[in-house]
């Protein structure tokens, strides 16, 4: 499981070094084979290859005539790029994906359980602050049974 927030610098070629604490798990679970794609926010999603393949199998089974499904398939599958950890634990984020997420030098890698999000650091700080200001734990019961069942 991937968790935590990590500030990372991209190198001049657009490579990102995965923090050491995640490398062994990524090498064991997927031999360093990763998939990076666009997220529904202005961020990227980074999956171990087997996790992405499972998501992809589920997405392609959804009704193709549904516009929402088609959009999600186009975004997640259409923009997906396979990448591999090198000997130093780095991988290259393709330029079109860096451009989509406005990634420059400083990025944030956020563990999300079975995947990561990659954000521009300035945009992440701004969005996180907005979400914190909007958050109301008292309103969780109004957000559906899944969120209402959470206990803090």
From Swiss-Prot:
This is Transcriptional regulator MraZ. One of its GO terms (biological process) is negative regulation of DNA-templated transcription initiation. Its main location: cytoplasm. Keywords: Cytoplasm, DNA-binding, Repeat, Transcription, Transcription regulation. GO terms for molecular function: DNA-binding transcription factor activity; transcription cis-regulatory region binding. The keyword Cytoplasm applies. Forms oligomers. PROSITE patterns: SPOVT_ABRB. It is found in: Cytoplasm, Nucleoid. The lineage of its organism: Bacteria, Pseudomonadati, Pseudomonadota, Gammaproteobacteria, Methylococcales. It comes from Methylococcus capsulatus (strain ATCC 33009 / NCIMB 11132 / Bath).
